[in-house]
Structure formats: structure tokens, C-alpha cells
A protein has these predicted regions:
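Structural hallmark of WD40 beta-propellers
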Residues: 36-40, 87-90, 138-142, 161-162, ...
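Beta-strand-rich domains and repeat architectures in extracellular enzymes and scaffolds
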Residues: 20-46
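Terminal intrinsically disordered, low-complexity extensions flanking WD-repeat/beta-propeller proteins
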Residues: 2-11, 15-17, 28, 87, ...
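Short loop/turn segments immediately following beta-strands, especially the blade-tip
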Residues: 52-60, 101-109, 197-201, 286-293
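Canonical WD40 repeat/beta-propeller blade segments in eukaryotic WD-repeat proteins
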Residues: 24-31, 76-83, 118-134, 169-176, ...
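Conserved strand-to-loop turn within each blade of WD40 beta-propeller repeats
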Residues: 42-45, 92-96, 102, 137, ...
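WD40-repeat beta-propellers
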Residues: 48-52, 97-103, 150-154, 192-197, ...
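Short C-terminal beta-strands that terminate individual repeats in beta-propeller domains
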Residues: 17-22, 60-64, 68-74, 109-124, ...
Length: 296
């Protein structure tokens, strides 16, 4: 009897610890696999969890279908941002970007392929990298975060080629308008800034918090998440999660979510996923109906 109770104690402690972890968890980043069947989500504990979207969206889905297929430790600190290439999952934390093979991720003991650090003013400066953005036509990666700059990295050579300045406070998020081509960035200064990549300069600014229907002064003005399909943009953070028409710079839909959101993703104009200050990833279909939530 004593032996049984001794064996049970650690198990109970583990369950309590995991429950406390979920209670204090923030999902900072998401990325959908190239095949569209899996969703990677990164949290404040440095973990990346891989969910099966095909299983969760199935008509026969059970609660277990909404749990991670695999979870692994990717960074010592929070996983602030992630993005997927045809073969790799790229993740970023405090001052570093790592690459993982999608083909190996579902296996236990997945190891990083490489790690890169942007050039900073001093060796003591290690600002967080809040956002990653792929520019396929240039085969490059844009990184942005705590130093208020947009850094461009050549994915073939691993070298950093330019830095764009404009934000007055640190940057939280990035998105690409492929037709333009323009990059959108959102930051602590409350602005969404549009950058022309060919001219390497800022061409438009939308100060979201100045629109009454979006403004939530008690949450602040910061823009924490951003996504676009070229004609439309979704952004949120301090202001409410809102769908915008970019050409007219007008808000059209306010999503019914109270908590500030840290990440939002479009997928083929059909699915919108949003995550923030909880262990949940909310999934919307038809850009308005909340279908279900995934949980760590």
C-alpha cells in the first residue's frame, strides 16, 4: 500500500504542474505545415506543439483529436514567432532563429538544423524576435522585434542584407501583400505600417487605435497580430481583433473576442485561427463563426 501511494504522488504532482502550466500559458505563435494538415503552435515556455488539423476538423473528431500529436522544447525562452517553408519550420525566440525539418518534427527527439542571430548594436543586446516573414520571390526572411527594425536575411547564405527603420517602439508582427509587393508591420506604437520592398521605404500608416469601433483604451494601443490576403487585413492586440479593407483603410468586422490576441492566421480564405492569453487556439470558419478551440 505504501509503495502504491509513493508511486501515485509524483503522478499527481505532475498533473498539478501541467494544469498550472496551462493556466499561465500564452500561445505566442502559429504556423501551418506545407501540406495543410498540421498546425504548429509555440508558447511562453519555449515549447512547440504540433496539432493535426485534419483530425480536429473531421466530422468524427473527439476531444483527443484536439490535443497535440507531439510537443517538444524548441527554445530556452518563449517561442515568439514561427513560419513554414516547403521543407522547414522556422522558429524565433530571444535574439535567435532556428530551423526544423517538417519531415522530422513528428518524430521524438527532433533536432534543430541551424540557428542564426541578427546583427545588434552591442553584444549585450538580445532583443526578442517577435515576427518572421518569408519573401518567396527573394528567397529571404524578414525578422522584427525588440530593436524596432525590420531585418532581412538571405535564406541561401544566412547573411543579413538590410534593415528598415520607422517604428518608434518595438515590433510585434509582420505580414506580406504578395501582389504589391509590400510588407505590413504592427508594433507597440499602435500603428500598422506598409513598406514597399522595391523602394525599401514606408508608404502607408494605419493608426488602428484612433478608430472608435476598434479602440479599447483599457488594453492599450499596441498591435500584437496581423494577417493579410492582399485586399484584406486582420489585426488586433490592444484594439479589438478586426477585419480591415486595405484600399479604403476601413474596418469592416469586429471579432467577438475579449482577450488581447497575440497571433492570427488566414488559410485559403476559409479558416482564421487566433490565439492569445490562454492555452486555446480559436478556429473561425467563414471569417466570423467560431467553430471550435484547440488546447495544449
Amino acid at each position: 500500500m505504501e509503495r502504491a501511494s509513493l508511486l501515485a504522488a509524483p503522478l499527481g504532482q505532475t498533473e498539478v504542474f501541467q494544469a498550472l502550466q496551462r493556466l499561465h500559458m500564452t500561445v505566442f505563435s502559429q504556423s501551418i505545415s506545407p501540406c495543410g494538415k498540421f498546425l504548429a503552435a509555440g508558447n511562453n515556455y519555449g515549447q512547440i506543439a504540433i496539432f493535426s488539423l485534419s483530425a480536429a476538423l473531421s466530422s468524427e473528431a473527439k476531444e483527443e483529436s484536439k490535443k497535440p500529436v507531439v510537443t517538444f522544447q524548441a527554445h530556452d525562452g518563449p517561442v515568439y514567432s514561427m513560419v513554414s517553408t516547403e521543407r522547414h519550420l522556422l522558429s524565433a525566440g530571444d535574439g535567435e532563429v532556428k530551423a526544423w525539418l517538417w519531415a522530422e518534427i513528428l518524430k521524438k527527439g527532433c533536432k534543430e538544423l541551424w540557428c542564426r542571430q541578427p546583427p545588434y548594436r552591442t553584444s549585450l543586446e538580445v532583443p526578442e524576435i517577435n515576427a518572421l516573414l518569408l519573401i518567396p520571390k527573394e528567397n529571404s526572411l524578414i525578422l522584427a522585434g525588440g530593436d524596432c527594425l525590420l531585418h532581412t536575411m538571405d535564406l541561401e547564405t544566412g547573411t543579413f542584407t538590410r534593415a528598415l527603420r520607422g517604428h518608434t517602439d518595438y515590433i510585434h508582427c509582420l505580414a506580406l501583400r504578395e501582389r504589391s509587393p509590400e510588407v505590413l508591420s504592427g508594433g507597440e506604437d499602435g500603428a500598422v505600417r506598409l513598406w514597399d520592398l522595391r523602394a525599401a521605404k514606408e508608404v502607408q500608416t494605419i493608426e488602428v487605435y484612433k478608430h472608435e469601433e476598434c479602440s479599447r483604451p483599457h488594453n492599450g494601443r499596441w498591435i500584437g497580430c496581423l494577417a493579410t490576403d492582399s485586399d484584406w487585413m486582420v489585426c488586433g492586440g490592444g484594439p479589438a481583433l478586426t477585419l480591415w479593407h486595405l484600399r479604403s483603410s476601413t474596418p469592416t468586422t469586429i471579432f467577438p473576442m475579449r482577450a488581447p490576441q497575440k497571433h492570427v492566421t488566414f488559410y485559403q480564405d476559409l479558416v482564421l485561427t487566433a490565439a492569445g492569453n490562454s492555452c486555446r487556439v480559436d478556429v473561425f470558419t467563414n471569417l466570423g463563426y467560431r467553430a471550435f478551440s484547440l488546447t495544449f
